[in-house]
């Protein structure tokens, strides 16, 4: 376990890395005893510093929701990070590629809450009842920590690699479609790069949301009405570069397009 002074130093280092767009050396290489709970402590302090600087928390992202990704990272549960107001973009936008370090894109669904959600004991039925609508979303992954050799402990401290999100397509009520069967085709520059179905997110994307409610309850937190929850990716991360146009076709749920400038 890390002491409070070290946790504060890491949070400050990550704030500076985001400001300068310069990744820091891997935390687990420098602090081999660092734990997942240490990482969440860093993330919570980092979030508080951002809120003190004027950013507004509008939701959470859930990561590492697929069994393949969990096996690859040697963990048995997802992770989560904060979404701030200035991270939420709309389809058709131009994204400043230079704003991010190692940007990648994933295909997801976002849940927008009409009621508060609080654990422990939150179930998938609580999530569906508390959801106003579900809408297609792309997540733009960022990294303030060097990529090579990075572990879940590094990623959690780095706000679960959250960079931004792009929302678009057609909002639907959570009971209007079978969310497990929502699918998407991800294009880069008119070439199909990835395809996926939302059942790849813990068998149902709402399962990630109730996991989140129960997990953050252990950290003394909860979700409020109006929060946006990125439920987890059902494609592999797609590397993007300056000049790339990304398009995600969700079929009946519409599409999302953005260009990296």
What are these regions (language model features)?
Residues 2-204, 245, 253-261:
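Catalytic-core "active-site belt" of small-molecule-metabolizing enzymes
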Residues 175-176, 232-233, 237-240, 257:
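Short active-site-adjacent structural elements
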Residues 209-237:
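A conserved acidic, glycine/proline-rich C-terminal tail/linker
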Residues 215, 244-246:
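Juxtamembrane/interface motifs at transmembrane-helix termini
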């Amino acid at each position: 376990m890390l002491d409070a002074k070290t946790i504060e130093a890491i949070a400050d280092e990550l704030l500076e890395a985001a400001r300068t767009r310069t990744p820091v050396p891997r935390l687990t290489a420098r602090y081999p005893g660092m734990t997942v709970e240490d990482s969440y402590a860093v993330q919570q302090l980092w979030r508080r510093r951002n809120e003190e600087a004027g950013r507004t928390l509008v939701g959470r992202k859930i990561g590492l929701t697929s069994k393949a990704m969990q096996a690859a990272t040697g963990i048995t549960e997802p992770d989560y990070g904060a979404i701030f107001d200035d991270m939420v973009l709309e389809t058709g936008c131009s994204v400043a590629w230079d704003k991010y370090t190692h940007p990648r894109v994933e295909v997801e669904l976002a849940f927008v809450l009409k009621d508060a959600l609080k654990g422990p004991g939150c179930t998938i039925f609580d999530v569906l009842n508390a959801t106003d609508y579900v809408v297609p979303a792309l997540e733009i992954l960022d990294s303030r920590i060097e990529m090579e050799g990075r572990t879940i402990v590094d990623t959690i401290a780095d706000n679960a690699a959250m960079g931004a999100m792009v929302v678009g397509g057609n909002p639907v009520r959570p009971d209007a479609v079978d969310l497990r069967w929502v699918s998407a085709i991800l294009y880069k520059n008119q070439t199909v790069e990835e395809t996926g179905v939302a059942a790849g997110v813990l068998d149902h994307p709402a399962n990630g949301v109730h996991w989140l409610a129960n997990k953050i309850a252990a950290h003394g937190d909860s979700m409020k009405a109006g929060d946006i929850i990125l439920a987890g990716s059902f494609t592999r991360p797609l590397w993007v570069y300056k000049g790339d146009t990304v398009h995600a076709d969700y079929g009946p749920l519409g599409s999302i397009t953005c260009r990296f400038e």
